[in-house]
């Protein structure tokens, strides 16, 4: 049981620069990812209120092909999540229901650096014109509520004596959010989202009720509906230094070839948005060093795959956004109960790789209270 954007593609003449990235829905998911200790079955008939606050910051974008680019990029969010969990028994199994609602706030002006803006292909001027060079895409954004999520769960394995647990938790998320199809970045995609979550935990060394080292594994499978009222958003694009030769090209083309910024104005084309199924895996190795407060520290690793995102225009043309749910991330988690009913958890996350998406450096705090 895990406690708790629209995409853009730059086109310049015949050159296509993929700058797709999934914020909003994926960022909100990250705020309430399964964390160490969530695999332990809780007592029956308790209420759990959980507050999350996640700060994400990206100074570079993971490349679709080749290396990442770390100039002129700022993509930053402050995500808060409120969550409620209630446990009860079903046929002798610890089970329950849960719901959470995220709010995604974009911090400051959002933008992504562009390593190289290719020049247009103009046969009348000899074919491929020189590149404009490095530049920046200005990303419009809308803060707001993400999609609500509703789930149920049941611990089919519950062996406290050996510290072994197994949980099954399906989720559903209706397409209700602060989505604005004309923005580059959004708090959600407004698609029906279905998730199947599986968790397993067991003690490797030590006593489950004392100092111990455990392993916790999580698998999450996502399936998505379509958003028929979405749009393919093109950001405003500017070059850092436009080659002087473009002054001549501008004159020769009667102004058709830009020689001044912005090279491309922002635009929005109505389209249907689709996302293919995606898969996520997490592994944690929590070491509980102070049993009196259940204090632990845990390294972790996260990997996602799949999730190809496409737009189908009204004329039937399908555009690959370039974005995938393909991310590799290191994690470090520490937590302790500060009273009999309140736990505080700190999480640090560092992206190693991301396919066409921000390489995030995240800090998160989670406060859970039992009543």
Task: Tell where the protein language model's regions lie, with residue ranges.
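Bacterial N-terminal signal peptides
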Residues: 13-24
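Outer-membrane beta-barrel biogenesis signature
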Residues: 24-50, 60
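Short loop/turn motifs that connect adjacent beta-strands in outer-membrane beta-barrel proteins
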Residues: 37-45, 87-97, 110, 157-166, ...
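Transmembrane beta-barrel strands of outer-membrane/channel proteins
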Residues: 49-57, 97-103, 168-174, 213-223, ...
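Outer-membrane pore/translocation modules
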Residues: 105-274, 316-324, 337
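Transmembrane beta-barrel domains of outer membrane proteins
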Residues: 40, 85-87, 153-156, 197-205, ...
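Outer membrane beta-barrel transmembrane domains
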Residues: 62, 121-126, 232-371
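Hydrophobic, lipid-facing positions within transmembrane beta-strands of outer-membrane proteins
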Residues: 47-49, 78-82, 146-152, 166, ...
């Amino acid at each position: 049981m895990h406690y708790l954007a629209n995409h853009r593609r730059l086109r310049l003449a015949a050159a296509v620069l993929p700058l797709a990235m999934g914020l909003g829905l994926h960022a909100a998911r990250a705020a309430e990812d399964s964390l160490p200790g969530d695999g332990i079955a809780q007592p029956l008939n308790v209420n759990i209120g959980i507050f999350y606050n996640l700060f994400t910051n990206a100074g570079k974008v993971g490349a679709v092909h080749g290396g990442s680019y770390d100039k002129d990029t700022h993509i930053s969010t402050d995500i808060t999540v409120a969550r409620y969990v209630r446990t009860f028994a079903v046929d002798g199994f610890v089970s329950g229901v849960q719901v959470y609602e995220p709010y995604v706030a974009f911090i400051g002006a959002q933008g992504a650096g562009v390593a190289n803006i290719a020049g247009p292909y103009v046969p009348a001027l000899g074919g491929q014109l020189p590149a404009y060079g490095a530049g920046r895409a200005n990303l419009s954004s809308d803060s707001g509520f993400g999609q609500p999520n509703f789930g149920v769960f049941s611990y089919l394995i519950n062996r406290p004596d050996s510290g072994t647990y197994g949980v099954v938790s399906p989720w559903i998320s209706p397409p209700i959010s602060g989505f604005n199809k004309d923005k580059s970045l959004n708090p959600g995609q407004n698609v029906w989202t279905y998730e199947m979550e599986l968790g397993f935990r067991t003690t490797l060394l030590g006593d489950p009720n004392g100092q111990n080292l455990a392993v916790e594994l999580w698998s999450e499978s996502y399936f998505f509906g379509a958003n028929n009222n979405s749009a393919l958003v093109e950001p405003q694009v500017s070059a850092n230094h436009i080659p002087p030769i473009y002054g001549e090209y501008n004159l020769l083309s009667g102004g058709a070839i830009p020689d001044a910024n912005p090279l491309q104005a922002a635009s929005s084309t109505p389209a249907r948005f689709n996302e293919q199924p995606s898969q996520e895996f997490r592994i944690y190795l929590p070491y509980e060093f102070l049993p009196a407060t259940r204090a632990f520290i845990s390294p972790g690793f996260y990997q996602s795959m799949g999730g190809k995102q496409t737009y189908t225009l009204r004329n039937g043309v399908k555009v690959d956004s370039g974005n995938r749910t393909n991310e590799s991330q290191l994690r470090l988690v520490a937590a302790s109960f500060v009273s009999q009913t309140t736990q505080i958890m700190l999480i640090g996350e560092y992206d190693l790789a991301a396919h066409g998406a921000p390489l995030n450096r995240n800090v998160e705090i989670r406060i859970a209270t039992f009543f």
